[in-house]
């Protein structure tokens, strides 16, 4: 009888200790959260406006290059070799300046990237802070982002804490 009591006591202690090491998981959908943040929607609209403006500026500059080339081709028979060389250099120089402008606006460290950093990064930081607060408050070990490349074949909707993050952000 005593061995059974000891066995039950040992089993209970073992089960309780395993349960205390259980980790809590949750997930959020940052794409969903971002669509619910008005500042993000406004920032995206501003970025799209800048992008369209810069794109039309670049397209107009490329049209100038094409017009220069068509003019050169039509007048080529009348030009001396020295004049041809100058025109070709002029066209090449103009094309390089348009490519530089395109890189300035849309390059990896271009104006579009900087605008995105200025307008969207603060919103992403607020989301990150709210997720950290949620994790600390509810003692979550891991919070996944459902909108990232992480493949979630199944997730319990009760574990989706996106609305809680929005609430912590004041939305």
Residue ranges of model-derived segments:
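Bacterial N-terminal signal peptides that target proteins for export
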Residues: 1-8
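Bacterial N-terminal signal peptides
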Residues: 8-17
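Sec/Tat signal peptide C-region and signal peptidase I cleavage site
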Residues: 18-22
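Amphipathic, charged alpha-helical segments and their helix-to-coil junctions
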Residues: 23-171
């Amino acid at each position: 009888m005593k061995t059974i009591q000891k066995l039950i006591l040992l089993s209970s202690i073992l089960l309780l200790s395993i349960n205390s090491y259980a980790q809590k998981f949750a997930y959020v959908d940052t794409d969903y959260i971002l669509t619910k943040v008005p500042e993000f929607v406004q920032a995206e609209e501003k970025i799209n406006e800048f992008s369209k403006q810069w794109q039309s500026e670049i397209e107009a500059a490329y049209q100038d290059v094409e017009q220069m080339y068509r003019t050169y081709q039509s007048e080529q028979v009348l030009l001396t070799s020295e004049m041809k060389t100058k025109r070709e250099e002029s066209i090449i120089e103009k094309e390089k300046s348009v490519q530089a402008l395109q890189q300035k606006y849309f390059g990896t460290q271009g104006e579009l990237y900087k605008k995105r950093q200025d307008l969207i990064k603060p919103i992403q930081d607020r989301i990150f802070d709210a997720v950290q607060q949620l994790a600390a408050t509810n003692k979550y070990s891991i919070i996944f982002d459902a909108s990232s490349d992480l493949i979630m074949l199944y997730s319990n909707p009760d574990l989706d804490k996106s609305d809680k993050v929005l609430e912590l952000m004041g939305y």
